[in-house]
UniProtKB/Swiss-Prot annotation:
This is Uncharacterized HTH-type transcriptional regulator YdfF. PROSITE patterns: HTH_ARSR_2. Keywords: DNA-binding, Repressor, Transcription, Transcription regulation. SMART domains: HTH_ARSR. Pfam families: HTH_20 (PF12840). The lineage of its organism: Bacteria, Bacillati, Bacillota, Bacilli, Bacillales. It comes from Bacillus subtilis (strain 168). One of its GO terms (biological process) is response to lead ion. The gene is ydfF.
């Protein structure tokens, strides 16, 4: 029996559910109230949609006392959403605020648990050009020089390879139309950059801000001038 694509398509066709899923693309957990606010819907409506998404296994929930926190189910769910963004019609910008939000997202953002946008794509390009990575089909492979480079950054390549997920997948960036680095390596890079405060998460959005020290580090370590 073929998978029921129509059921998933029906779920994603609802604007409120789509908005909730896009909010969860930052890779973090969110309480229902916050997701309702971000989707501009009532809490009761958000609960209805969250239950539908849970039934479809697109999201998961964690219970802490009386509170429930939601996240995307896994990287496969995130990949489906990211691919749909490539073919979805672009929303018309209606205000200066929306224009700035769009610009911020295009520049640097999280794509579930890795870095995307202009900065993410430039990082991938630079690592390939420097010979740290090479593209093989739709994956990135770490070279011997790359293994030493990532080790110096504090990323254990073997540890990342042993995770139960793709190691370094080419993820097509919906705004740049080029690949950035997904998978365990992409996540390890994002985590390391957050730890070193090269980048910081912006509140209530997937947008990422590059710090002043981060701009220096990107140029020094990654040969990416921001």
């Amino acid at each position: 029996m073929n998978p029921n694509i129509a059921k998933i398509s029906s779920l994603l066709s609802d604007p409120s559910r789509s908005s909730i899923l896009l909010s969860l693309m930052d890779g973090r957990i969110h309480p229902a109230g916050e997701l309702a606010y971000l989707a501009n819907i009532k809490p009761q409506t958000a609960s209805f949609h969250l239950n539908k998404l849970l039934e479809a296994k697109l999201i998961s929930v964690e219970k802490h006392g009386r509170h429930r926190y939601y996240r995307l189910a896994d990287s496969d769910a995130a990949n489906v959403i990211e691919q749909l963004l490539h073919i979805a019609p672009k929303a018309k910008v209606k205000s200066l605020k929306e224009s700035k939000e769009k610009k911020d997202l295009h520049f640097a953002r999280t794509c579930y648990d890795h870095l995307a946008g202009y900065v993410g794509v430039q990082m991938a390009h630079s690592l390939v050009e420097q010979g740290m990575l090479k593209k093989v089909d739709l994956n990135f492979e770490v070279t011997s020089e790359g293994a030493l480079f990532f080790s110096k950054l504090g990323i254990n390549e073997e540890q990342q390879r042993n995770k139960r997920r793709a190691f370094a997948r080419c993820c097509l960036d919906w705004s740049e139309r080029q690949h950035h680095i997904a998978g365990a390596l992409g996540n390890a890079l994002l985590v390391r950059m957050l730890e070193e405060e090269w980048i910081v998460r912006m509140p209530k959005t997937r947008a990422i801000r590059i710090t002043q020290s981060g701009k220096i580090a990107f140029e020094k370590h990654l040969n990416v001038k921001i």
